Amino acid sequence: MTNISLDKLVTESRNENTKNIDRVETLEMLKMINDEDKKVAEAVEKELIHIAKAVEKIGKAFLNGGRLIYVGAGTSGRLGVLDASECPPTYGVSYDLVRGIIAGGESAMFKAREGAEDSKKLCIKDLKNIDFSKNDILVGIAASGRTPYVIGGLEYANGIGATTISVTCNPESEMSKIANISIAPVVGPEAITGSTRMKAGTAQKMVLNMLSTGAMVKTGKVYGNLMVDLKATNEKLVERAKRIVMQATGAKREQVERILEETNFDVKLSIFMIESSLEKMKAKEILDKNKGYIVEAIKEIS
């Protein structure tokens, strides 16, 4: 257990702006919370340089066969699992490429597992169970920056030569000193003292969104601002796939539906076939040669 006292943590300090939150009308209470929430985006903005460095590292890792692994406890762990779980349907990647590990295992997603966050060894065990390697990226998430479970993971990852990133909301935390890249949006005291699922959790979610989204953009999963590697696994996504191809190419719905059927709803290939006027096999050959980057594939045939 690290010996940082809670009274030194920004996230545990008392918020002077909300001391009377229990004595005001409902609307005023919500305004207090909303005023605090407005500070989150500004805090994240101040960390963009560090976030950019992290995105570059993650993107390179993906291109070299590495993975993005989130570790955290409680709210922080849940946010990692949430971000990871959205990557396969959104970007068509395997469920192994971006993974979230929460202290205490899957059951801790729904019910707190007291004490799980206090074990460094438990995180090391969890990382070994997924064959974590030096080619992977480890993102440790903890509002306080002092969670032993996460610190154990960061230390282990450093020890095997992997890139480590910390996402905390306290400056100069132990985690930030251990990680290769420190991302620490300082959102200030919570509206409810110590309730880091609020501003700190929101800031962490914003950062994780940027990390995964930025890396997917860097690795050709986006064309313009369209998610061209999504998996059309339900009716809504089938319709979205059609709209994406129409938006990307300007083609009529009838042509788009025909091409999508031909490619088994491979959105990226469908777009390139329409843009290049090539047959399926030739289009796929060129797209594969350019590692799935539509822009680069189009340049090759221009």
Curated annotation (Swiss-Prot):
Gene Ontology BP terms: amino sugar catabolic process; N-acetylmuramic acid catabolic process; peptidoglycan turnover
TM helices/strands, residue ranges: none
Ranges for domain SIS: 58-221
Pathway: Amino-sugar metabolism; N-acetylmuramate degradation
InterPro entries to which the protein is assigned, alphabetical: Etherase_MurQ, Glucokinase_regulatory_CS, MURQ/GCKR, SIS_dom, SIS_dom_sf
EC number, as in UniProt: 4.2.1.126
Database matches in Pfam families: GKRP_SIS_N
Any one GO molecular-function label of the UniProt entry: carbohydrate derivative binding
Keywords: Carbohydrate metabolism, Lyase
Catalytic activity: N-acetyl-D-muramate 6-phosphate + H2O = N-acetyl-D-glucosamine 6-phosphate + (R)-lactate
Active site: 86 (proton donor), 117
Family: Belongs to the GCKR-like family. MurNAc-6-P etherase subfamily.
Note: A lyase-type mechanism (elimination/hydration) is suggested for the cleavage of the lactyl ether bond of MurNAc 6-phosphate, with the formation of an alpha,beta-unsaturated aldehyde intermediate with (E)-stereochemistry, followed by the syn addition of water to give product.
Subunit and partners: Homodimer.
Protein's job: Specifically catalyzes the cleavage of the D-lactyl ether substituent of MurNAc 6-phosphate, producing GlcNAc 6-phosphate and D-lactate.
Protein name: N-acetylmuramic acid 6-phosphate etherase
Source organism (scientific name): Clostridium botulinum (strain Loch Maree / Type A3)
